[in-house]
Swiss-Prot record:
Entries under Gene3D superfamilies matching the protein: 3.90.1070.10, HAD superfamily/HAD-like
Amino acids binding Mg(2+): 8, 10, 175, 179
Disulfide bonds: none
Lineage: Archaea, Methanobacteriati, Methanobacteriota, Stenosarchaea group, Halobacteria
Name of this protein: Phosphoglycolate phosphatase
Length: 227
């Protein structure tokens, strides 16, 4: 039997141009074990993807700030401190980088994401001045200002508890520093070749191929193992 999966989305299920790879719709709908979509994106994104895959809405959103499993949603992060940091960042001349119509954060409940064009040094300075309750995570796609201690890994532990599956039974695939906590609790972890240094160091295996090419290869190997 194939193992349950914990899958990042951006950089893992996508192409180099950021588009969702069509193979997602070939490989995941019939995966005969739970599939957890674990992302830094706002809650509606992984829910929508699960819906279009025809799978249960088992998701970890906002880097662990929101977890949805078995029809229950848990808010594990607190947006108050991250929003205060971003407001202070603005007051010091910083620009989050999304323009007036910020759909990146429109539905975000527990953190704030800023464009990679934002002033990272200033953002980290402001976040550090706020104390230890807030941290900045660079996913390679955005800077996420989030509650310290909230992580995808803790989200996966919560999902596992709800499903009666130990986190060490999951196979995790990802590409970024926000996947390190998932790799730490999963039984087996893979970084795709485009992964950043933190993810590569934390993963059990760094595969040769990038983006969905790498993920598809891992899934094929997992299927072969169970035949």
């Amino acid at each position: 039997m194939v193992p349950p999966l914990a899958l990042d989305i951006d950089g893992t299920l996508t192409t180099a141009s950021g588009r969702l790879d069509a193979r997602v719709f070939e490989l995941l709908p019939d995966w005969d074990a739970p599939v957890v979509l674990a992302t830094g994106k706002a809650f509606p994104y992984p829910v929508a993807l699960a819906h279009f895959l025809g799978r249960a809405e088992t998701v970890i959103a906002e880097n662990g700030g929101v977890v949805h499993v078995d029809g229950e949603t848990a808010i594990l992060g607190d947006a108050e401190a991250p929003r205060a940091v971003v407001e202070a960042f603005r007051e010091r001349g910083g620009d989050p980088g999304w323009g007036a119509r910020d759909t990146v954060n429109r539905w975000r409940e527990t953190e704030v994401a800023l464009s990679l064009d934002a002033d990272e040094a200033l953002l980290r300075e402001v976040a550090a001045a706020a104390g230890g309750d807030v941290e900045v995570v660079d996913t390679g796609y955005a800077y996420h200002v989030k509650s310290t201690g909230v992580s995808k890994g803790r989200g996966l532990e919560r999902v596992g508890d709800a499903l009666g599956i130990g986190p060490d039974e999951f196979v995790a695939i990802g590409d970024s520093e926000n996947d390190v906590s998932t790799f730490a609790v999963a039984g087996e972890s893979y970084a795709v070749a485009n992964a950043d240094g933190a993810a590569r160091e934390a993963a059990d295996i760094v595969v040769a191929d990038s983006y969905m090419d790498g993920t598809a290869g891992v899934l094929a190997d997992l299927r072969t193992r169970t035949e």
